[in-house]
């Protein structure tokens, strides 16, 4: 399965132990990962400004993701006008990377899941998917 994680899931995986860390580890071990340039940029900003991690730690996370995931940097724009520009970019990059699933905690993205061309699930929903649920 090709998996794309939104920024909020990756931040939670880095910042805390719990379901987000578990699903990211499971995806790294068992599936193919893609990451969009938008997520890489947002992740760096959050790690540096909100979590106040050192630049070296943010660089390490960026390098880790680039090593273990395919980076999607170009994607055609989407028409989901009810989404913020960054959310549209995250979804567009997931689609361009042929993700089977976008895992996010973003309520706006989860709200349009039924109309999206790929599966969009919460971290808990992805955990259930991994476990055959």
Where are these regions (language model features)?
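Conserved glycosyltransferase catalytic-site signature
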Residues: 7, 87-88
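Short, well-structured N-terminal submotif of metal-dependent ribonuclease cores
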Residues: 1-35
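PIN-domain endoribonuclease scaffold, especially VapC-family toxins
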Residues: 24-81
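Short, flexible loop segments at the rims of nucleotide/cofactor-binding pockets, characterized by
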Residues: 10-13, 77-83
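Acidic, PIN/NYN-like endoribonuclease modules and their adjacent C-terminal/linker elements
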Residues: 81, 88, 97, 101, ...
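A secondary-structure boundary/capping signal
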Residues: 6-7, 36, 105-106, 122
């Amino acid at each position: 399965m090709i998996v794309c994680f939104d920024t909020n899931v990756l931040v939670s995986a880095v910042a805390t132990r719990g379901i987000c860390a578990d699903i990211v580890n499971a995806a790294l071990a068992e599936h193919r990962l893609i990451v969009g340039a938008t997520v890489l940029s947002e992740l760096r900003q959050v790690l540096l400004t909100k979590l106040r991690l050192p630049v070296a730690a943010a660089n390490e996370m960026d390098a880790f993701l680039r090593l273990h995931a395919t980076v999607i940097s170009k994607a055609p724009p989407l028409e989901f006008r009810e989404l913020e520009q960054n959310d549209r970019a995250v979804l567009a990059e997931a689609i361009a990377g042929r993700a089977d699933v976008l895992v996010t905690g973003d309520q706006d993205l989860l709200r349009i899941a039924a109309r999206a061309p790929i599966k969009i699930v919460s971290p808990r929903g992805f955990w259930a998917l991994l476990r055959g649920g």
